[in-house]
A protein has these predicted regions:
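Charge-enriched, short contiguous segments at helix-coil
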Residues: 115-174
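Short, hydrophobic, well-ordered secondary-structure elements
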Residues: 46, 55-82
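Flexible secondary-structure boundary motifs
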Residues: 76-123
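Generic surface-pattern signal
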Residues: 24, 28, 47-50, 82, ...
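Generic structural signal for well-ordered, non-membrane alpha-helices
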Residues: 39-43, 67, 71, 131-134
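Charge-rich, solvent-exposed alpha-helical interaction surfaces
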Residues: 5-8, 18-22, 26, 37, ...
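Charged alpha-helical initiation segments
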Residues: 2-60
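Intrinsic-disorder-associated interaction segments
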Residues: 8-16, 20, 27, 31, ...
Length: 174
């Protein structure tokens, strides 16, 4: 009976179509152009936003959104004739200019893309992706220094930022 009570207490009804509708609402332009796999990645994070649960770490909530942002970058690059060679890295496409504190695109990729708006959108996407994902999904060598998302509001903000960046990028590129 205790297990049934807990199941009922934490059970939440989330309709897949409602999540898809919310995604369409948040991505009015990009939504109709996004690869279906990227949409599926985003729906996981949107679904987790609906669950009312108190956690010590909400990193899992943002995983789908940041993975979708990575896929979005790779999809745009692929459409421009650039295939990311290293599955775990964008080292052939972007680099950090530590002197200026910015991320830049390699000259070879800029020439291949041949569109300043697309280049700028991709650099913005990569900057956010890099700043968020690397710290969240890789543990620090001093484990206690590893980044956690300790508040629900921070997780929601990251998810919303990813959605906004994707939408803004499509508006710029189209």
């Amino acid at each position: 009976d205790i297990f049934k009570l807990n199941e009922d207490l934490y059970s939440i009804t989330i309709n897949k179509n409602d999540i898809k509708d919310e995604l369409s609402h948040k991505l009015p332009i990009a939504g109709s152009h996004l690869n279906d796999t990227i949409k599926k990645m985003l729906t996981g994070s949107i679904t987790l936003k609906k669950i009312d649960i108190d956690l010590d770490d909400y990193s899992s909530f943002v995983f789908g959104a940041l993975r979708a942002l990575e896929a979005f970058i790779k999809d745009i690059l692929f459409k421009k004739g650039i295939q990311v060679k290293n599955i775990n890295s964008f080292v052939d496409v972007f680099f950090e200019d530590k002197r200026r504190g910015t991320f830049e695109m390699t000259t070879e990729c800029e020439l291949q893309i041949n569109c300043q708006k697309t280049r700028n959108a991709l650099v913005e996407c990569f900057k956010y992706y890099s700043n968020q994902r690397h710290g969240l999904f890789h543990a620090d060598s001093v484990v206690s220094m590893s980044r956690l998302i300790e508040s629900r509001s921070e997780a929601d903000e990251i998810i919303n930022n990813v959605l906004n960046i994707i939408e803004r990028s499509y508006r710029e590129i189209l």
